[in-house]
Amino acid sequence: MAKQTPLYQQHLADGAKMVDFHGWMMPLHYGSQLDEHHIVRREAGIFDVSHMTIVDLHGARTREFLRYLLANDVAKLTQPGKALYTGMLNASGGVIDDLIVYFLTEDYFRLVVNSATREKDLAWIEQHAAPFGIEIREREDLALVAVQGPQAQEKVQAILKAKGLSDADVAAVASMKPFFGKQAGDFFVATTGYTGEAGYEIALPNEQVVDFWQQLLAAGVKPCGLGARDTLRLEAGMNLYGQDMDEGISPLAANMGWTIAWQPEDRQFIGREALTHQREKGTDQLVGLVLTEKGVLRNDLPVRFTDSDGVMREGVITSGSFSPTLGVSIALARVPLGIGEQAIVQIRNRELPVHVTKPGFVRAGKAIVQY
């Protein structure tokens, strides 16, 4: 039996088309995935992401533990509320999951991990936390919603004020830079997201989330489903775990090299030795593709190119879709080193030319890629 978030009945009332997503009944769309995509780029949309897993870590050695567990370095987190995006790797350098870690106090950090990887993530964390004396608490008492788009922050701030939060709390939320989180009353508000737009991700008690959702709808924020969430994150060049990377893929081959903290050299983290060998040897790379001809780039399609030695090389599309913002088809693809600015994708029996770009296409509603 698939699990339901606290917003399940609300989704039905809002007219959602529900689907089973990794064991959770989640809204795919509320009538038009295309309209939902555009509303986030132009105004504001709200997503139920309560299927995500929030894990709180407590203990005097929590920072030390996370410096060992994660490829990015939580030593960078010196200001309370500051967050990092990172991979959690296995010994061979594969990605067990990608996650966000928040520094709250010296003995209290928060992780937000993917729903599809919940059980293995918790088992991995528990296995490695034991020697550090860490208390692990999964926050099943909290729901999680994402309000995203150019009007999102203004709308959320108005509702927080209407809910009786102090002027100081609302001002502190309004002044947060990207990748910060703050506890404001019952709400943990973070300037994070998965769309390439400004906005908040808000954790709040399960029993309060329906009322909060309804207040956002009344303020003109539109409900959005997993379909729009996927096209928005693809336009933003953000990875989806299980497609763009997994336990058999190095972060170096998934456009996650920037999330590996190589310095200081004496920090030993899980996967470091394997990553060092991979970096020396060279790995595949994740690139962007743009198809301006008629057709849609889909997952698993082959990508071919001729390298500088005249050798035909082949990669594969990891995530592909039509881009509503750009009006063309886009994709992320893992390819061997040596690709130029052009490649060929085979769609059924047609070989179509594609432009090779950096893996990111849209930010803040504007194209950031040339093709």
UniProtKB/Swiss-Prot annotation:
Keywords: Aminotransferase, Transferase. InterPro entries: GCS_T, GCS_T_bac, GCST_C, GCV_T_N, GcvT/YgfZ/DmdA, GcvT/YgfZ_C, TrmE/GcvT_dom1. GO terms for cellular component: cytosol; glycine cleavage complex. The keyword Transferase applies. Its EC number is 2.1.2.10. It holds the Pfam family GCV_T. One of its GO terms (biological process) is glycine decarboxylation via glycine cleavage system. It catalyses: N(6)-[(R)-S(8)-aminomethyldihydrolipoyl]-L-lysyl-[protein] + (6S)-5,6,7,8-tetrahydrofolate = N(6)-[(R)-dihydrolipoyl]-L-lysyl-[protein] + (6R)-5,10-methylene-5,6,7,8-tetrahydrofolate + NH4(+). One of its GO terms (molecular function) is aminomethyltransferase activity. The keyword Iron-sulfur does not apply. It comes from the Bacteria. The glycine cleavage system catalyzes the degradation of glycine. PANTHER family: AMINOMETHYLTRANSFERASE (PTHR43757), AMINOMETHYLTRANSFERASE, MITOCHONDRIAL (PTHR43757:SF2). The glycine cleavage system is composed of four proteins: P, T, L and H. Belongs to the GcvT family. This is Aminomethyltransferase. It comes from Pectobacterium carotovorum subsp. carotovorum (strain PC1). The gene is gcvT.
